[in-house]
């Protein structure tokens, strides 16, 4: 094995362990925020949804700045600083007794993610070859699912005692991740050139093909973020206990660990990336329509299975397509900007979802938010279909090679 290949291999193992810490730290805390503040403290879902949406919007909306800074100064300082900021945000969530404190905590958490997320994704692109990139993203997503279950299990167990224990544990994991990166992450440059901050940002904004693709994904993310807001709430409502939420994440982990990698390997030889993305989005949209009409937990888990099946089909294709369309001269900027769809979709999905949830219950129409989310998914599907049929993107890029 050549030195370059050995460095790539060691780098990928480093990324896998680092990703496990990040996922564990996040999922110990965030799935339980809506349960604690809405179900246990009686806050309005709109207030909590706004906090979650604010975190999503700030982190992903400012991602292009975090990526551009990493293009200029390298990945390591941004990652370490960002993880410490995330830990500080979680500590403030533990102290939240008023909505403004929760909002401030979510902003701190978001700024941390703004700094560490784009360079981490850019490192994946740097350390993987194009033909193996889709499979490595699949491995990361499988790990995300397993980490989500373990994190949710730990968080649910700690919630029995005190929500502050939940937050302090999540903060501790991110401090550990910061130390891990500070000690062992080499001083990688993530772009082929040391691009000035504003030049990298300008390069992305002028790339209309990438710009349109990212904005189109807003609707996709409006659906995907509901695993952090409305799905936990309705599982808790129907099951009658917050402990049932861990089974929702167990479903995700089971499907991801058994199907995500095989689906990615099978479909990459038969379908283009955008076709796989649209197929997954169709399943996610389809699963939304009946949710508000059911009152039995096993039926709900069946619909959640369909939703997660769509996710495991779409996510590797979405990540690989974003990476394939990125200019290697400004990888950090591109990966940062690719989060803009998640910023907009997260803000609209969390805040709008919380408002629709409250409105649906006030009007005695509990199916209202779920039906509208399904419609949004289908509209996004149509927009993606038009984009990729009207804009001819090189077949090599779309196949991920």
Curated annotation (Swiss-Prot):
Subcellular locations according to the entry: Cell inner membrane
TM ranges: 13-33, 34-54, 78-95, 99-116, 139-159, 165-185, 214-234, 243-263, 289-309, 340-360, 365-385
InterPro entries, sorted: MFS (IPR011701), MFS_dom (IPR020846), MFS_trans_sf (IPR036259), MFS_Transporters (IPR050171), Multidrug-R_MdtH (IPR022855)
Membrane topology note: Multi-pass membrane protein
Listed Pfam families: MFS_1 (PF07690)
GO cellular component, one term: plasma membrane
Keyword Transcription regulation attached: no
GO molecular function: transmembrane transporter activity
Entry annotated with the keyword Membrane: yes
Principal subcellular localisation of the protein: membrane
Keywords: Cell inner membrane, Cell membrane, Membrane, Transmembrane, Transmembrane helix, Transport
Similarity annotation: Belongs to the major facilitator superfamily. DHA1 family. MdtH (TC 2.A.1.2.21) subfamily.
NCBIfam families the record matches: PRK11646.1
Record protein name field: Multidrug resistance protein MdtH
Source organism of the structure: Photorhabdus laumondii subsp. laumondii (strain DSM 15139 / CIP 105565 / TT01)
């Amino acid at each position: 094995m050549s030195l370059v290949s050995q460095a790539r291999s060691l780098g990928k193992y480093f990324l896998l362990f680092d990703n496990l810490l990040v996922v564990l730290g996040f999922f110990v805390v965030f799935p339980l925020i809506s349960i604690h503040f809405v179900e246990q403290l009686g806050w309005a879902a709109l207030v909590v949804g706004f906090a979650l949406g604010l975190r999503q919007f700030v982190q992903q909306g400012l991602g292009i700045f975090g990526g551009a800074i990493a293009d200029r100064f390298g990945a390591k300082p941004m990652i370490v600083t960002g993880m410490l900021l995330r830990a500080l945000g979680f500590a403030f969530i533990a102290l939240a007794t008023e909505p403004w404190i929760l909002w401030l905590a979510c902003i701190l958490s978001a700024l941390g993610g703004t700094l560490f997320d784009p360079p981490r994704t850019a490192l994946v692109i740097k350390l993987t070859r194009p033909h193996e990139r889709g499979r490595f993203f699949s491995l990361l997503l499988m790990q995300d699912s397993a980490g989500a279950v373990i994190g949710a299990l730990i968080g649910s167990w700690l919630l029995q005692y005190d929500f502050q224990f939940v937050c302090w544990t999540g903060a501790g994991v991110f401090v550990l991740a910061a130390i891990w990166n500070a000690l062992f992450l080499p001083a990688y440059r993530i772009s082929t050139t040391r691009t000035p901050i504003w030049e990298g940002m300008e390069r992305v904004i002028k790339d209309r093909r990438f710009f349109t693709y990212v904005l189109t994904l807003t609707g996709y993310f409006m659906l995907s973020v509901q695993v952090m807001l409305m799905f936990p709430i309705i599982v808790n409502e129907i099951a009658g206990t917050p402990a049932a939420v861990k089974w929702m994440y167990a479903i995700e982990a089971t499907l991801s660990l058994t199907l995500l990698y095989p689906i990615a390997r099978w479909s990459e030889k038969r379908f283009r990336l955008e076709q796989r993305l649209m197929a997954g989005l169709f399943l996610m949209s389809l699963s939304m329509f009946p949710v508000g009409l059911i009152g039995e937990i096993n039926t709900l888990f069946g619909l959640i299975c369909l939703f997660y099946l769509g996710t495991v089909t779409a996510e590797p294709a979405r990540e690989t397509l974003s990476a394939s369309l990125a200019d290697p001269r400004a990888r950090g900027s591109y990966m940062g900007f690719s989060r803009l769809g998640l910023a907009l979709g997260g803000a609209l999905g969390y805040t709008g979802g919380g408002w629709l949830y409250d409105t649906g219950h006030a009007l005695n129409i509990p199916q209202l938010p779920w039906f509208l989310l399904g419609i949004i998914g289908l509209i996004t599907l149509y927009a993606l279909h038009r984009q990729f049929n009207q804009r001819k993107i090189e077949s090599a890029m779309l196949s991920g090679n």
